[in-house]
From Swiss-Prot:
It comes from Bacillus subtilis (strain 168). GO terms for molecular function: hydrolase activity; metal ion binding. Signal peptide: none annotated. The gene is yhcW. It is an enzyme of class 3 (hydrolase). Its cofactor is a divalent metal cation. InterPro entries: HAD-like_sf, HAD-SF_hydro_IA, HAD_2, HAD_sf, PGP-like_dom2. CDD domains: HAD_BPGM-like. This is Putative phosphatase YhcW. The active site is at residues 8, 10. Its EC number is 3.1.3.-.
Length: 220
């Protein structure tokens, strides 16, 4: 029986990932190159040491000013995020979870400052009883440590948790932790190949939480 929901953050609650990829793609195109999604997709949802501007240098065969490009990336990303809201259905799921008496947690490979800042900006920070980030663990996703820690601090077993993820690395982490996992891919991650999950939604607005839980609980 599912007693807790644990949400990813980037790309799942707030679609930072699509904007991040599109900003990088703009910069790559301005330098006569492209950033293939097949390359970028491998690092979504984790903290892999991929350095996009080093990759760009390799593609075009010349040195670039990383500091200037990083600043440009930040400015363009911030501009895009000014009016960004939670993905469709997120707030409804959080409210429904509270009505159903479920515990609510968050597990993100990003750092706490990033996650908490964005959650406060969209007014959802107080909805989470537990927020686990990269600051709390030795290894982020696809390692299951973030999910296991979130479950522990919510006072439930991993088997009693339902994880919501948008990335391949995130879904791997949730399943390795022994949780059920619903994937809700975004514009970017929707093109990636997911292997192990329990249900797929294109949006949380697609199905009411109570119906989703009934469906998943019936699989036991």
């Amino acid at each position: 029986m599912i007693k807790a929901l644990i949400f990813d953050f980037d790309g799942l609650i707030l679609d930072t990932e699509t904007h991040e990829y599109e900003v990088l793609q703009e910069i790559f195109e301005e330098h006569g190159s492209v950033l293939p999604l097949s390359v970028w997709g491998k690092v979504i949802g984790t903290a892999a040491g991929f350095r996009p501007f080093e990759y760009l240098e390799e593609q075009i065969g010349k040195k670039l000013n990383h500091e200037e490009l990083t600043q440009l990336r930040r400015e363009r990303f911030a501009k895009r995020m000014e009016s960004e809201k939670a993905r469709p259905g997120v707030e409804a799921y959080l409210n429904a979870a509270k009505d159903l008496g479920l515990k609510i947690g968050l597990a993100s490979s990003s750092d706490y400052k990033w996650v908490s800042g964005h959650l406060k900006q969209i007014g959802l920070f107080d909805d989470f009883e537990v927020i686990q980030t990269a600051d709390d663990v030795e290894e982020v996703k696809p390692n299951p440590e973030l999910y296991l820690l979130a479950a522990k601090n919510l006072g439930v077993s991993p088997a009693e948790c339902l994880a919501f993820e948008d990335s391949v690395n995130g879904s791997i982490a949730a399943k390795r932790a022994g949780m059920k996992c619903v994937i809700v891919p975004n514009k970017v991650t929707g093109t990636l190949m997911f292997e192990d999950y329990d249900h797929r939604l294109e949006s949380m607005a697609e199905m009411e939480l109570a119906l989703l839980l009934d469906h998943l609980n019936s699989q036991n």
